[in-house]
Curated annotation (Swiss-Prot):
Gene that this sequence comes from: LHCA6
Free-text disruption phenotype from the record: Slightly lower NDH activity in immature leaves. No chlorophyll fluorescence increase in mature leaves. Smaller version of the NAD(P)H dehydrogenase-photosystem I supercomplex (NDH-PSI) supercomplex. In the double mutant lhca5 lhca6, drastic reduction of NDH subunits accumulation upon increased light intensity.
Cofactor annotation comment: Binds at least 14 chlorophylls (8 Chl-a and 6 Chl-b) and carotenoids such as lutein and neoxanthin.
Name of protein: Photosystem I chlorophyll a/b-binding protein 6, chloroplastic
Record InterPro entries: Chloro_AB-bd_pln (IPR001344), Chloroa_b-bind (IPR022796)
Swiss-Prot/TrEMBL keywords: Chlorophyll, Chloroplast, Chromophore, Magnesium, Membrane, Metal-binding, Photosynthesis, Photosystem I, Plastid, Thylakoid, Transit peptide, Transmembrane, Transmembrane helix
Residues involved in chlorophyll b 2 binding: 112
Organism: Arabidopsis thaliana
Amino acid sequence: MAFAIASALTSTLTLSTSRVQNPTQRRPHVASTSSTGGRLMRERLVVVRAGKEVSSVCEPLPPDRPLWFPGSSPPEWLDGSLPGDFGFDPLGLGSDPDTLKWFAQAELIHSRWAMLAVTGIIIPECLERLGFIENFSWYDAGSREYFADSTTLFVAQMVLMGWAEGRRWADLIKPGSVDIEPKYPHKVNPKPDVGYPGGLWFDFMMWGRGSPEPVMVLRTKEIKNGRLAMLAFLGFCFQATYTSQDPIENLMAHLADPGHCNVFSAFTSH
């Protein structure tokens, strides 16, 4: 719910350049060729580790990036700096910088929720087909009996989500104000990046701390999968409303009879 970022490349180049430009810097005595190789390996390891400690800003997409309509010209406010920017804004909704920033964060959080929702629908249905659970149906899950009554669950969810969303809102207004990563006085600390908290809890594999270009690739993959998940969830809602069936059940029926079991048959049968 809570939703990495100076340049690792710059950090690496700075460390390397400082060694070249400061020849008077004291170095440990080298006794043999093998120890020289070991020292160089240790220096390279230090450089790599130093780069991993600073999260990277996304590398903006080039001017010739793919656009939603080939041959079109993107609006000036969509300059390729946002993940998943294909120049699509026909109504000019993102012309205001503050509004564009809000839209980007709103799309990001809705994408993540949609990916969680689609996963939470598909996996239980697969488990039901494998015989691990019985009588699963995601669209009437709210009417089931749980360990507490619906009012208690609703209040608990509102309190927990309110706390997390409040912190996310504070981070949007003042980036880094709710950062939970520890700061070290003798190390280059990552700068805050709204929507990508990183750290042990949200980036334990440190994928968001590479060089800028791979970071942009990963974030673009996330937003593209999130957009697909939002469309998938709308499709699940449509299926549940018109067929009262689950997604995999609808998929199996469509594969068995594509000509008669499709989206058009849902309209003609009602």
